């Protein structure tokens, strides 16, 4: 066979990896229509498994890692030593920006990793293509900037300024002012739900739908100001760190936290969740770095940092980056097992780390610090094989427009955010009688309305006729009946006055003419 053809043994081995479970035997089913449908479903599942296995074999790009020889340690390698030993294209992606006039820089990459957005503490905003150096926009707001965030593409971004959150386009034009988001410290964006989330000094977690402009939810955490807000990429649940050492998990449909975790004895400085949603890493003011299992909500192990860590971030391949003081330390395989030595270390002389983010699909770690921005090479951090249907770094303008339209059409509702991301499409296997009983318990009791006969005439034939027919329907017969009731009411009142020997009621002529009417 030709070397280009796929090895059947490799395909079979990979097919077992993507198996969807035990296959059904349709021969035992007597119903012909049901048997035919199950056969089609099984064939479809088999084709999917085979396609996934062949796609994995065709992946030519494999992630590379630093490998030490003998007594060498990978954390001793410096960036100036790595640059000559990597590809020229990768070496050009390592650069440094000296921006010491506008304070510490927070930043954000787009989902495809093409654009970067910088936000200086003193009001400097810059958006550009970091590969080519093409500048999109640059602003000087002359106002405090606490955080910046791209939306689902590079057309719009949000800036948390001194009082409100503002939305700009990629040309620097102010589009919206979100006055419901006051004194925000941290921003986050849920791309599949098109929700912008924020939390600030007031301690309110807010969800804003950027496609409709509607404020979806506003939850009071009750734990004071917070500046730690990160999402779980697996289920879109927001993780909020608080000053009392707790981490709370939130969804828009719940006014109370889904989960409360006491993670540290002091304030939570930052946290990060891996792509699978299984592990969470937290950094506290007690100089501890803890790894948590989100399936059991238990601590796995912890690390000690010489000074409290400022920032945490996890790459697509699971590399953990920790920013503490002037250092940025990268740990490999630090989630499942405790490591004795870090993978890499980078020093920022006479500066301090402000923000950390890995660039999607690249072996690049971005570091925002007090004197600017720096991009360093971290071999093995990026995912080499991307899904072009979801994020395509090389998409044309027309493809990006089609992707945006598809994202709007496939937008998920906020009610679909849950701790269990697989609950959609599941079959409720409870007995029908049990489901009916649960539905009746949840249904509010219906109170039957009974007319009260308080006085004479309240339950007459005309009244019973009006109650029997629809109350909101007005026809000629109803008007005639209501007029008859009004005349009957007046006659009854006059009869009562005559029995009590009271003078008949005269017409009310108003305030000006009432003094001329006899009061006898």
Swiss-Prot record:
SMART domains, sorted:
BING4CT, WD40
Q: GO CC terms for this protein? A: nucleolus; small-subunit processome; sno(s)RNA-containing ribonucleoprotein complex
Where is the protein localized? Nucleus, Nucleolus
Q: PROSITE patterns this protein is in?
A: WD_REPEATS_1, WD_REPEATS_2, WD_REPEATS_REGION
Origin: domain of life: Eukaryota
Region Disordered: what ranges?
A: 1-20
Q: What is its main location?
A: nucleus
List residue spans for each WD repeat: 99-140, 142-179, 218-260, 263-302
Q: Alphabetically, which GO biological process terms does the record hold?
A: maturation of SSU-rRNA from tricistronic rRNA transcript (SSU-rRNA, 5.8S rRNA, LSU-rRNA)
**Membrane-spanning parts:** none
Q: Which UniProt keywords apply?
A: Nucleus, Repeat, Ribonucleoprotein, Ribosome biogenesis, rRNA processing, WD repeat
Query: Pfam families attached here?
Result: BING4CT, WD40
* GO function term, MF aspect, one: snoRNA binding
- What does the function comment of this entry state? Involved in nucleolar processing of pre-18S ribosomal RNA.
Name of the protein: Probable U3 small nucleolar RNA-associated protein 7
Tell me which species this is from: Schizosaccharomyces pombe (strain 972 / ATCC 24843)
């Amino acid at each position: 066979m030709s070397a280009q053809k796929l090895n059947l043994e490799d395909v079979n081995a990979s097919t077992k990896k993507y198996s969807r479970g035990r296959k059904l035997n349709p021969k035992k089913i007597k119903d012909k229509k049901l048997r035919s449908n199950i056969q089609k479903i099984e064939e479809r599942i088999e084709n999917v498994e085979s396609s996934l296995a062949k796609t994995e074999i065709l992946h030519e790009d494999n992630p590379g890692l630093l490998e030490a020889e003998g007594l060498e340690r990978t954390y001793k390698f410096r960036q100036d030593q790595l640059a000559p030993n990597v590809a020229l294209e990768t070496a050009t992606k390592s650069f440094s920006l000296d921006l010491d006039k506008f304070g510490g820089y927070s930043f954000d990459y787009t989902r495809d990793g093409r654009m970067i957005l910088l936000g200086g503490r003193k009001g400097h905003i810059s958006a550009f293509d970091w590969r080519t150096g093409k500048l999109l926009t640059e602003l000087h707001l002359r106002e405090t900037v606490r955080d910046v965030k791209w939306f689902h593409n590079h057309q719009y971004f949000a800036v948390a300024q001194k009082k409100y959150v503002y939305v700009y386009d990629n040309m620097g034009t102010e589009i919206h002012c979100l006055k419901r988001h006051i004194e925000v410290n941290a921003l986050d964006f849920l791309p599949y739900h098109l929700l912008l989330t924020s939390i600030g000094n007031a301690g309110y977690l807010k969800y804003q739908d950027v496609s409709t402009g509607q404020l979806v939810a506003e939850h009071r955490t009750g734990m004071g100001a917070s500046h730690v807000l990160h999402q779980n990429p697996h289920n879109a649940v927001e993780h909020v760190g608080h000053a009392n050492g707790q981490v709370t998990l939130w969804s828009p449909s719940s006014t109370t936290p889904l989960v409360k975790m006491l993670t540290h004895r002091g304030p939570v400085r930052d946290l990060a969740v891996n792509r699978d949603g299984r592990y969470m890493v937290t950094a506290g003011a007690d100089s501890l770095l803890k790894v948590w299992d989100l399936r059991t909500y238990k601590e796995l192990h912890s690390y000690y940092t010489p000074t409290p860590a400022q920032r945490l971030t996890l790459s697509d391949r699971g590399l953990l980056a920790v920013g503490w003081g002037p250092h940025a330390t990268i740990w490999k395989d630090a989630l499942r097992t405790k490591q004795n030595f870090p993978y890499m270390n980078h020093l920022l002389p006479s500066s301090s780390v402000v923000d950390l983010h890995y660039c999607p699909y690249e072996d690049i770690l971005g570091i925002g610090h007090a004197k600017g921005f720096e991009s360093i090479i971290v071999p093995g951090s990026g995912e080499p094989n991307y899904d072009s249907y979801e994020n395509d770094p090389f998409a044309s303008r027309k493809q990006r427009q089609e992707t945006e339209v598809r994202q709007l059409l496939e937008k998920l509702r906020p009610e679909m955010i849950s701790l269990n991301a697989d609950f959609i499409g599941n079959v409720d296997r409870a007995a029908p009688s049990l489901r009916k009983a649960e539905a009746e318990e949840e249904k509010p009791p219906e109170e039957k309305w009974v007319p009260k006969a308080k006085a004479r005439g309240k339950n007459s034939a005309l009244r019973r006729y009006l109650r029997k027919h629809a109350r909101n329907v007005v026809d000629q017969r109803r008007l005639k009946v209501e007029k008859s009731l009004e005349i009957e009411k007046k006659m009854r009142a006059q009869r009562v006055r005559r029995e009590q020997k009271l003078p008949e009621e005269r017409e009310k002529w108003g305030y000006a003419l009432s003094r001329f009417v006899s009061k006898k």
